[in-house]
Amino acid sequence: MSLRFVIGRAGSGKSTLCLREVQEELKQRPRGKTILYLVPEQMTFQTQQALIGSEDVRGSIRAQVFSFSRLAWKVLQEVGGASRLHIDEAGVHMLLRKIVESRKDGLSVFQKAAEQNGFFEHLGSMIAEFKRYNVTPSNVYEMWQQLDAHSSSAEQKLLANKVYDLQLLYDDFERALIGKYLDSEDYLQLLVEKLPQSEYVNGAEIYIDGFHSFSPQELEIVRQLMICGARVTITLTIDEKTLAQPVNELDLFYETTLTYEKIKQVAREEKIEIEKTIPLMEQPRFHSPALAHLEAHYEARPNEKFNGEASVTISTAANLRAEVEGVAREIRKLVADEKYRYRDIAVLLRNGESYYDVMRTLFTDYNIPHFIDEKRPMSHHPLVECIRSALEIISGNWRYDAVFRCVKTELLYPLDVRKEAMREEMDEFENYCLAYGVQGKRWTAEDPWMYRRYRSLDDTNGMITDSEREMEEKINRLRDVVRTPVIRMQKRLKRAGTVMQMCEAVYLFLEELDVPKKLEELRIRAEESGDFLFATDHEQVWEEVMSLLDTFVEMLGEEKMSLSMFTDVMSTGLEALQFANIPPSLDQVLIANIDHSRLSDVRATFIIGVNEGVIPVAPMDEGMLSDEEREVLGAAGIELAPTTRQTLLEEQFVMYQMVTRASEKLYISCPLADEEGKTLLASSFIKKIKRMFPNVKDSFISNDVNDLSRSEQISYVATPEVTLSYVMQHLLTWKRYGFEGNLDFWWDVYNFYVTSDEWKQKSSRVLSSLFYRNRAKKLSTAVSRDLYGDIIKGSVSRMELFNRCAYAHFAQHGLSLRERDIFKLDAPDIGELFHAALKKIADKLLRENRTWADLSIKECEHLSVLVIEEIAPLLQRQILLSSNRHFYLKQKLQQIIFRTSIILREHAKSSGFVPVDLEVPFGMGGTGSLPPMEFSLPNGVKMEVVGRIDRVDKAEDENGTFLRIIDYKSSSKALDLTEVYYGLALQMLTYLDVVTSNAQTWMKKGHAASPAGVLYFHIHNPIVEMKGDATEAEIEKEILKKFKMKGLVLGDADVVRLMDNKLSTGSSDIISAGLKKDGSFSARSSIASEQEFNVLQKYVHHTFENIGKDITEGVIDIAPYKMGNKAACTFCNFKSVCQFDESLEDNQFRSLKDMKDSEAMEKIREEVGGE
């Protein structure tokens, strides 16, 4: 029994010495005593390759490469102890979830924390840490007693409570495992116990290579190996000079020196002979003088400069993607020009979550074979999502999001259907569920679902059309596809008495869906497309899910569990599932995490993402215990994993290891922005390297080829997949701005794509964008006729839409596009309810020969309740009756109608104008409809402007009959003559024109009528602020002012007084007008003379004719208006259709100048020739 150390700095040949010794021994005595070569888990594959890589050793039974965990498995297989079921990480998390749920009421700190994402991962890691550091539940309990007895501050009490919770959960966890199961840490503890019984290990030659430190648990394994083995050789990265000095925590080799001393102490305790240490002083790894200098002087203060030609490259990149592309280009260059193999190259990084997806995509595009040494979660695989969402459907009462997450896995689809067709049908089905607000009991009820297109409150036709019947049948068929398998599982889960039966219900759910066959189809499809990684994913996921169910049954099979707990425990297990890494092929670029990788034999290393806070790592508290809490426990005798402070001290050694991996070339880079454009800073580590290599120039990796010289641009010509984007970028810039210089090779690249048989078709769509102009071509007369017909019948809103943006009009009224109908109460629905409610009250008053002025406050309230109750079942598929939230909203809407009724009552008392009719149709046909506004266009097409007028009021005096228009709005609005001039606000003046033009035939007395004005009435329930103790009358007066109607009224004092008979001088509380003492109007009055009203009406006719002419001539320009802070695109539903983009030359806003009303009126006069 002896112990031997092989020490040396990085690259000194420690592993090489050990491997050569083993190979020589195998060559001399291939059937001798066992040789164990122990390495960290990440090194096993490459060490096995290195061991049998020489010509003399092509294989071996005598020598085996193990990690500690694999050695445990080997020994337990030999001497017994492996009969207990292994519980993996997913099983641990599931068991912990169950323990926490059952202990929840007794927990002090973790009761609420258990609901946070990642809690069970942290809890599992904490328990594993306890085990690695030989801390038992009783140790934790004793620590709690000690802390509880001396807790005085809030921080001390929090730690005591946290330790109490941890010992409860740890103890429960150990009790659940005892005699039945083994987790990964238990294997190592069993290894310690069983090693003395192992004939395989007894007398073995043992090498321990690649470790820098050992946990107490691992140190016990080393102890037993020294006792059992013939000789243990341990390699450590230490400079021999360090051993001759007192240990200092700031030393580069502090951690490995401590490890050296700990192992020696164990050897002394066990009376193990300590052989003479073998120090290695040379640097055989480094073929580059610069890298040899970097290793030899890394820790020197001040930094030792290297003035020769450095094989170190430092780069900053515009962003993360540009950085990865730069790495990919350099790798291709090394392989093509310098005869590197891909396996000679490694990429090291720390923040892999930011890089891995980008690297997978770009390295594939650059045809670079690569292996990412990082396990991927299974949580996004369709099978895992299907199980999780199906259980969520059942436990969460069939919520929409859970249902359609399950649907979109496509595992609910019948096996023999065409996926593309079923996807389209399911999209329609989802639209139906959104429009009808389908969730909860509606899914499980047997009543067939109804389909009716909702049009408006006035649509009371109960007849079903053929298309509606056809859609109804399809919806009910698809409903059964979705719900039938889930309901079957739901019934089984409710009948289940034990966890085993619940797991069986999940298994049968998957079997009845033919999931194995569907996964096999996915695997075959992935292989056919060359995506072998995803092909193996589909194989692994089924095996892992089955293993998870087996583990669940083994652990808790006979226990009873609520459905909600079963769902939570299963979800926790599913979240922990990971895809196993496929061993790399013989020639791939290795992409690895700096902290976990153990590289050897690479010629070039790329260290990427070297940003401040990443390398060196920024201090952060993670896990169950903070640094301060760990230090308290450490002072009390419980040793745990290093604190953040200790980790930061070790960071220098991690970075030293990182830069000394390559033998020939070192590349260091950082992005200046992340994927979202957020600024990133270069690490101070880069400054250190620059100080050591002053001749190294910092290069910049641009994502814009136009910033580069010709020689640099040529390097961007790589694979056809990648180069296509760069040729596009360059030629697009040339097209817009032109360029100088001889860059004809981009045209050569372009010609390759357009002439290549393989790439001509693939690239045509992309390259065609070079000549793309986002311009809507004018429709032909024939197409325009086909779309709009020989008679154009449209509302005023449609005409205004055309003037806002001709393309939006084409999309809505030509192509009949519309947004997806969603079961929610929007502003148009609320507006429709307000109109209907006020009409119903007004109709009731007309039938009873009463006016608004005749109503009492109590009647206003009663009528508002009555009409809302009558309308609610008819509005938007009974949305106001669908939930408590909507019921509350219904009450708020009723209060608004009540308040509005009170104001209309007050207006009626103060006005000589009385309502003639509400919701007055024109051009709609039927009884009571006024004729449309008709136009005969120059090209022979007829146009009819139709609509419905909210309210028409009438007043009479000795000067005749006057009519005014009242339009109910759910938001504040005024009439802007600038908008009238540009054709954006034509509605009110059109309505006034229609009623005054048809007054003689429409009014009962048959008199002509003059325009009195147009006014907007804002329906709302305002809040007013009053100073002091205001009386109720004062408050009501202030509220009345909030309802002042804005618009444009006839500039006739008598007519204005008819609108507000309380007005003598001053401003009206009812309309936006006021009178001075001399009887003239105040400056802020919104008035127009009768002649101006005539000019405005004439201008409206003129505008409609122009609109009609443009529509029929096929004008569909993508030219939205913009005026001040208003723009047509702001609330447009068709932006994704027109793809308006200001950066394109063809896409610019129609800028409209805002004007004063007087200026606008003058321009209107000029247009129509009015005086």
From Swiss-Prot:
Other observations noted: Despite having conserved helicase domains, this subunit does not have helicase activity.
Cofactor note: Binds 1 [4Fe-4S] cluster.
UniProt name for this protein: ATP-dependent helicase/deoxyribonuclease subunit B
Pfam families: ADDB_N, PDDEXK_1, UvrD_C
PANTHER family: RECBCD ENZYME SUBUNIT RECC
Role played: The heterodimer acts as both an ATP-dependent DNA helicase and an ATP-dependent, dual-direction single-stranded exonuclease. Recognizes the chi site generating a DNA molecule suitable for the initiation of homologous recombination. The AddB subunit has 5' -> 3' nuclease activity but not helicase activity.
Recorded superkingdom: Bacteria
Homology family: Belongs to the helicase family. AddB/RexB type 1 subfamily.
Positions that bind ATP: G8, R9, A10, G11, S12, G13, K14, S15
Domain UvrD-like helicase ATP-binding: 1-390
Enzyme Commission code: 3.1.-.-
Record-level GO BP terms: DNA recombination; double-strand break repair via homologous recombination
Entry keywords, A to Z: 4Fe-4S, ATP-binding, DNA damage, DNA repair, DNA-binding, Exonuclease, Helicase, Hydrolase, Iron, Iron-sulfur, Metal-binding, Nuclease, Nucleotide-binding
Coiled-coil regions listed: none
Positions that bind [4Fe-4S] cluster: C805, C1129, C1132, C1138
Cofactor entry: Mg(2+); [4Fe-4S] cluster
InterPro entries the record matches: ADDB_N, DNA_helicase_suAddB, DNA_helicase_UvrD-like_C, P-loop_NTPase, PDDEXK-like_dom_sf, PDDEXK_AddAB-type
GO MF assignments: 4 iron, 4 sulfur cluster binding; 5'-3' exonuclease activity; ATP binding; double-stranded DNA binding; helicase activity; metal ion binding
Subunit structure: Heterodimer of AddA and AddB.
Domain UvrD-like helicase C-terminal: 281-587
